[in-house]
Amino acid sequence: MSVITSSGNVISLDLDDTDIYQHFEDSKSCAKIILSQINSDRIYDRFLKNQKDMIILDIGANIGLFTLYAKDSASHIFSVEPTPSHQKLFEKINGPYDNVTLVKAALSGTDESMNFYICDYNSTCNSLIDRGSDVIEVEGLTFKSLLEKYNIDHVDFCKIDIEGSEMLAITEETLKPVYDKIDRMFIEVHATYSGPDMRWEDNLVINRRKIETVLQNVGYKYEILPSRYNDTIHVFKDIHTK
């Protein structure tokens, strides 16, 4: 099992490591789905293939598969992940690389300790959104504080996949201060509610439109990328860089 990077290099994953092996065998981890998006679907190639010397943010880094994919395109990647078990695997997978920094925190709307919910049916769904799961306390960082803490002056590409937490982290108040610093984003939007009065698919559309409004009001342009649920937004500044 391996990751095919943005430059086409093949990096084998150490399945002799019991923790890594068990994570990929655990149906609740979605690790194989994430790997398929990277290796087979190549969903990030349009933005990163054969690029060099980029500053990249990996928000919702999980165990670091996207970070591993993108490291060839980066002068440095800052990977944000609040789940302790994912952090442990991330360090095993990306530990050898000098251009990778793991940020043990959650992107959020405020700079304070936050309740973070560990999903019992799918560890990929861990989130700041309460889905009735176990709770831990994690550090919360806004975009502005994240960039200031790590002395990041410019971001070429920011991937965000944080399982509903985007509804708290991506607001006009958090995005305006960093508009001049973040050029391009790839945002996966998630449903944060489902019940007898609303399907999760309908809630996802509502959430996506809220994010679209934020992006427009801040000054970004965007497009909805083709996907099963139309849940992925490509965010950019200049129509000529689309």
Where are these regions (language model features)?
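Conserved beta-strand segments of alpha/beta enzyme cores
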Residues: 76, 99-101, 137, 221
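Active-site segment flanking the S-adenosylmethionine/decSAM binding pocket
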Residues: 49, 55-67, 85, 135-197
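Hydrophobic packing residues within well-ordered alpha-helices of enzyme cores
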Residues: 70, 90, 116, 169-170
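Glycine-rich adenosyl-binding loop in Rossmann-like folds that engage adenosine-containing cofactors
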Residues: 16-46, 103, 108-145, 149-150
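Short, conserved SAM-binding/catalytic segment
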Residues: 90-100
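Active-site-adjacent beta-strand anchor residues
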Residues: 80, 103, 159-160
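S-adenosyl-L-methionine
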Residues: 1-80, 84-92, 150, 195-242
